[in-house]
Structure formats: C-alpha cells, structure tokens
Regions:
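Short alpha-helix in the alpha/beta-hydrolase fold that links the catalytic acid
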Residues: 80, 266-268, 315, 395-404
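Conserved alpha/beta-hydrolase "acid-adjacent" motif
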Residues: 259-262, 391-398
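C-terminal structured domains
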Residues: 385, 400-412, 426
Length: 447
C-alpha cells in the first residue's frame, strides 16, 4: 500500500491510497488468501480513499466500505461533509472507505485510448473486459480488507449496482461483513437480462408519459426535434452524429430527481429559428456522452451474467425493438432509460473501440461465479435495503422477490424517493437507525 496524500475538504479528513492487485484473480470463494498464481500475471492499480470526519481523524471507529453504483462508476468526490447526505451521516459512526472500482477513476482506468493501445483482437479484448465485473471487484475489496485493514470485519453500503456487489460479497466472502446496507440495488437472482428489461421498459414508457403530462408542450417540441434529426444530417459539437436514438437516451435521467425539470429546460431552447441551436446540441452531447463513463455502457448488460447462461445478445435492444412505441418514428417519442444499444457503440466515439469486443461478449455463455443462491438463503449477515417502489432502473418487484429468499434481509419499501434517494435525502440515516434499533450493529461498538 502507498499513501499518496492526505488533506481536508470542509468537515472531512481524506487520505488517498493505492495498492496493486492482479488483473485476473485466482481466489476461491471463502478462502482466506488468493492463490499465489494470481500475482504472476498483469497487475493494475486499485485506488481508494479513507474518509473521516474532521472531529474523528484519530478515533478508532469501525470501517464502512462504500460500493459505488454503475457499473463502471468511480467513487464519489466529496466537496464537504454536507455535500453527500449519506456520507455526512456515515462519518459520524465510521471511517469510510471509498474505492475507485477497477477500470474507473484512478484505478487503471479503461477507456477507448487504452483499448487501442493494448492492440488486442476482439476476443482478447472481450476476455480483458471480463476482469472488470463483480467477481473481480469483490476480490479487490477483500484483498484491501485483509492486507490493509488487518482483516477487520466491515460494514458495506451499496448504492444501485453497489447492491449487486453487496449480494456478490455476501455470496463469496460472508465472514468478512458485519452488516450491509443497500439503497436501490438488489439484483434479481437468479438473473436474466431480458427479464430485467421486460420489467424496466414499461417503466421507461410510464416515466416518459409522466413527463409529457407535467409539460404537455414538450411532447410536440421533442417530436419536432426528432423529425429534424431524421431529415437532416446533424453533428454534435465533437463530430458524433446526432441521431433520434441519441435524443431518446436523454430518458436515462428519468429515474432521478428533478429529471423532468432538467429535460424541460433542455428542450426549452432547442431551436434557433428553424434549426437546432448550438446550445441544445452541446446539452445533448454532454448529457449522453460516454467519455469518462465508458465501462458503464460496456458492462451494462453483463452485470446480469452469472456462471453458465444463454447469450445475452443485446437484451435491452431486443426488448425495445419489439415494443413499437420506442421506434424512432413513433410519436409521442418515447425516451429510453439505461439501455446499452448497439447504435451507441457505432455513434459514440468514446465507445467505438469497444464495438468488436461487444459482439464477442454478447455471444458468451461462460461467466464468473458472482452469486451463490444457497449461501444467500442461509445468510445471517443483517442486510437492510431501501427499495424504491417507483425505481426505473432496478424493478422493486424483482428486488423484493430476491429478498424473500435472502436470509436476515430487511426491506424498507418507500415511494418518497427515486433511485438517487441516498444522494438526495436521509435514506442511509433511516437504514442505520433501523439496524441500530434491532441490535444489528452492537458488536461493532463493543470494546
């Protein structure tokens, strides 16, 4: 481990660290240590931050590992103790570990320029990318826990995809965790990508209709934009094509608040006379570009892969194409939320280098073991989960179905928040208080 720096942001003490981890782990589930062969091959950086409140810098508080949403999400960068609601509460009770998951942020980031530099063929690139999924991420975390933090049990907090990682951690290394919190991110187990989109595509449609209901004039404006993009060759400021599909991808924000208002003001100045305004095209680019979040789209459908499966084969695209309301020519134009489509790998210059490997991955049937249903059924780790009833990204019904088969799990179902509730309100505070009241954190604070 190398400490890179330490500093304060208002109300928080922050330490930056980096450790080297194998690109490919050979580490049996539940084993105390990885196989020595893991360290014989290529290595990558794992960057993490240790965050404490300014008042508790030297306090011996228990550890909380934050598992970031994504996939392909780097750890949050706090501006102050108050800038992230869950963090402002967490540092009262814990030292918080923020990791940049492998391939993101400062952890040997994977982007199109790296893919080009590696110079591998499509199959080799696909195999390389498989090293950036949950089975590897959890082993990174476990390596950190055993080598840096003296094998101390820690609490985990998983937001969105971080909940998928939580279920993987509970499956693979259950003895490492004292308690877990999850916000908007219980995966459906057993997993099936097409099933997921069959549940979420209707939610995309409902969200679009809700938006048009709030701002009726926007329905015509969005349709007019789509008509213009269909009839003219329009380029975004970076030279990428501005397509109707790219316009539809603005719906990816609709699971957050205040997304409808953001969309309303985005299209408010879409036209300059008869033509699309430069400002709107810049907004379309900045809201839909994959620069800086390449793995979010590259790995999007493969977070539903576990062990041996049928080929995923562009599951979201298949469901959307079979739902005529999402055709580019349909009016009112339906907007799309969180769907990795083949078109974006052709149109978005940040993703084109990944396109050949995507076709390989979409046809693969063999994946790492991420979830152990038997282990989850006998789980005794307290898991407190916030399930957002109207969640557009992670269907609440599927979440509750999974939790019904996970031991010692406790769901708080609420329609007060959208998918980003942990960043917008006192969601973690509620879950923490519930766990405390049930005695689920008692052993952490016994001296």
């Amino acid at each position: 481990m190398t400490q890179l720096s330490q500093y304060y942001v208002p109300g928080l003490h922050v330490e930056d660290h980096v450790v080297q981890v194998p690109l490919h782990w050979n580490w049996a589930a539940g084993a105390a240590q990885p196989d020595a062969s893991s360290f014989a091959g290529e290595h990558i950086d794992l960057f993490y931050r240790l965050v404490s409140s300014a008042q508790n810098v030297h306090a011996d508080l228990p550890l909380l590992l934050f598992l970031q949403g994504g996939p392909g999400g780097m750890g949050p960068r706090p501006m102050s103790a108050q800038s992230i609601p869950w963090l402002s509460e967490a540092v009262k009770h814990f030292r918080v570990v923020l990791i940049d998951q492998r391939g993101t942020g400062r952890s040997s980031r994977v982007d199109s320029s790296l893919i080009r530099r590696r110079g591998q063929n499509a199959r080799e690139t696909a195999d390389f990318l498989k090293n950036f999924l949950a089975d590897s991420i959890i082993r990174d975390c476990e390596f950190l826990r055993t080598t840096v933090f003296n094998s101390a049990q820690w609490v985990t907090l998983g937001q969105s995809y971080g909940g998928f990682l939580t279920m993987a951690y509970v499956s693979l290394f259950p003895a490492s965790i004292a308690a877990s919190f999850v916000t908007g991110g219980i995966p459906h187990i057993p997993m099936n990508a097409r099933e997921v989109y069959e549940h979420t595509v209707p939610r995309m449609m409902a969200k679009t209709k809700e938006y048009y209901g709030l701002y009726p004039d926007d329905e015509a404006v969005v349709g007019r934009i789509a008509d213009f993009l269909s009839s003219e060759k329009v380029l975004l400021p970076n030279g990428d094509p501005a397509s109707v599909r790219r316009l539809q991808m603005l719906g990816g924000d609709f699971g957050m608040k205040p997304s409808f208002e953001r969309m309303h003001w985005t299209v408010d100045t879409a036209f300059n006379g008869e033509y699309l305004s430069d400002g709107f095209l810049m907004e379309l680019f900045s809201s839909t570009t994959s620069y800086g979040s390449e793995l979010y789209w590259v790995l999007q459908e493969f977070i539903y892969a576990n062990k041996e499966i049928e080929p995923i084969n562009w599951a979201a695209n298949d469901v959307l194409r079979s739902t005529k309301q999402f055709d580019e020519s349909s009016r009112p134009l339906m907007l799309i939320g969180e769907a990795a489509l083949p078109e974006i790998f052709d149109e978005d210059s940040a993703l084109r280098a990944f396109r050949p490997a995507m076709d390989e991955l979409m046809s693969d049937t063999q994946w790492g073991t991420v979830y152990d249903e038997d282990q989850l059924a006998r789980n005794d780790i307290p898991i407190h989960a916030a399930v957002y009833f109207d969640d557009m990204y992670v269907d609440s019904g599927l979440q509750l179905d999974t939790l019904s088969r996970v031991g010692n799990s406790h769901a708080w179902v609420t329609n007060e928040f959208e998918h980003d509730g942990a960043r917008m309100g006192a969601v973690f505070e509620h879950l923490y208080a519930e766990a405390l009241s049930r005695g689920h954190l008692e052993k952490l604070f016994l001296k």
